Amino acid sequence: MAKKSKVIKELKRQKLVEQYADIRRELKAKGDWEALSKLPRDSAPARLHNRCTVTGRPRGYMRKFKLSRIAFRELAHKGRIPGVKKASW
């Protein structure tokens, strides 16, 4: 389980990215790099990091399910992810 503070910080970053998305797009189109650099650092989408919705783990993230590999495995074995079953051939 990730620290709550890290998960909250990531949510704060997501809100900032959404808030400044239009402004950033306009400034990039104009080529106004000075104004762009004066925006908050956390408003840049490059600073976002995907986190597992269950555990908050930042590594081993599966985009399609929004889960880390560990949480995915546990939930898949329990049959809680629709359409996912263990492979056998």
Swiss-Prot record:
Q: Cite the entry's keywords alphabetically.
A: Ribonucleoprotein, Ribosomal protein, RNA-binding, rRNA-binding
A cellular-component GO term for this protein:
cytoplasm
Any single GO molecular-function term of the entry would be: rRNA binding
User: What InterPro entries does its record include?
Assistant: Ribosomal_uS14, Ribosomal_uS14_bac/plastid, Ribosomal_uS14_CS, Ribosomal_uS14_sf
Pfam families under this entry? Ribosomal_S14
| GO annotation terms (biological process) | translation
Q: Which domain of life is it from?
A: Bacteria
Q: Which family does it belong to?
A: Belongs to the universal ribosomal protein uS14 family.
Per UniProt, subunit arrangement is: Part of the 30S ribosomal subunit. Contacts proteins S3 and S10.
Known function:
Binds 16S rRNA, required for the assembly of 30S particles and may also be responsible for determining the conformation of the 16S rRNA at the A site.
State what protein this is by name. Small ribosomal subunit protein uS14A
Which source organism does the UniProt entry give? Bacillus velezensis (strain DSM 23117 / BGSC 10A6 / LMG 26770 / FZB42) (Bacillus amyloliquefaciens subsp. plantarum)
